[in-house]
Amino acid sequence: MHIFINHGFRDYLKDNKKAFDTPINIMEMGLGSGLNALLTAESIDQQVVDYIGIEAHPITEKATYLSLINSLPHALDNQLIESFWDTPWNTPTKITPIFSLEKRHGKIENLELTPSSIDIIYYDAFAPECQPHLWQEDIMRTVLSWLKPGGYLLTYCAKGSFRRTCKSLGCRLESLPGPPGKREISRFVKQSKES
């Protein structure tokens, strides 16, 4: 299973007991094919989830989208796949009775969210070498401002300078085992002001 699901969504539910009808708010940077959103939707049993995914360069051809999704080793529910594709951009849409999705077309530097409104951030941007601006302190200050105290930010990035930036912005680093080919991943937990 995917690191965002196991070390993000599932661990967050274990560590933060919420009523099932109280939404878990998830924001994904780098929505791409929607794999993380689809896996999250498949993973929930009773917990309500409101999911925002931001993508600067969305897939525009349905055939390309289906080819990407169908090439995955994990078979996904066809109705869920169709619902994801059919969801209009920039409009919150109920995909299942307990999973709402808002696909936002745009760049993270233009995204406006309420401070301390997000429980989990899946930071699935390309590596700092490919998109350095997405890993700079000013962007991370904004992104982390959206995270609730105790909230998680997960990323494949284990670069020292990025880790130091997030720690300096009030997050505790948890290094976790990575998937095959990746030694470790980073989970940051936003500390409360009192910590």
Identify the meaning behind each predicted range.
Residues 7-17, 21-82:
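SAM cofactor-binding core of SAM-dependent methyltransferases
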Residues 56, 135, 158:
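Short beta->alpha hinge that forms the Motif I/post-I loop of the SAM-binding pocket
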Residues 65-114:
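S-adenosyl-L-methionine
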Residues 119-133:
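A short SAM/SAH-binding and catalytic strip from SAM-dependent methyltransferases
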Residues 134-149:
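A short glycine-rich, Lys/Arg-flanked "PGG" loop and its adjoining helix->strand segment in the class I
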Residues 150-157:
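Conserved beta-strand signature within the Rossmann-like core of class I S-adenosyl-L-methionine
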Residues 159-195:
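Class I S-adenosyl-L-methionine
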